[in-house]
Amino acid sequence: QNRHPPIPPAP
């Protein structure tokens, strides 16, 4: 279970 906000995809 991830307890961190989703990381946006890099451009």
UniProtKB/Swiss-Prot annotation:
<comment type="similarity">
    <text>Belongs to the bradykinin-potentiating peptide family.</text>
</comment>
<dbReference type="GO" id="GO:0030414">
    <property type="term" value="F:peptidase inhibitor activity"/>
</dbReference>
<keyword id="KW-0382">Hypotensive agent</keyword>
<keyword id="KW-0964">Secreted</keyword>
<protein>
    <recommendedName>
        <fullName>Bradykinin-potentiating peptide 11j</fullName>
    </recommendedName>
</protein>
<dbReference type="GO" id="GO:0090729">
    <property type="term" value="F:toxin activity"/>
</dbReference>
<feature type="modified residue" description="Pyrrolidone carboxylic acid">
    <location>
        <position position="1"/>
    </location>
</feature>
<dbReference type="GO" id="GO:0008217">
    <property type="term" value="P:regulation of blood pressure"/>
</dbReference>
<keyword id="KW-0483">Metalloprotease inhibitor</keyword>
<keyword id="KW-0873">Pyrrolidone carboxylic acid</keyword>
<keyword id="KW-0800">Toxin</keyword>
<keyword id="KW-0646">Protease inhibitor</keyword>
<comment type="function">
    <text>This peptide both inhibits the activity of the angiotensin-converting enzyme (ACE) and enhances the action of bradykinin by inhibiting the peptidases that inactivate it. It acts as an indirect hypotensive agent.</text>
</comment>
<keyword id="KW-0481">Metalloenzyme inhibitor</keyword>
<dbReference type="GO" id="GO:0005576">
    <property type="term" value="C:extracellular region"/>
</dbReference>
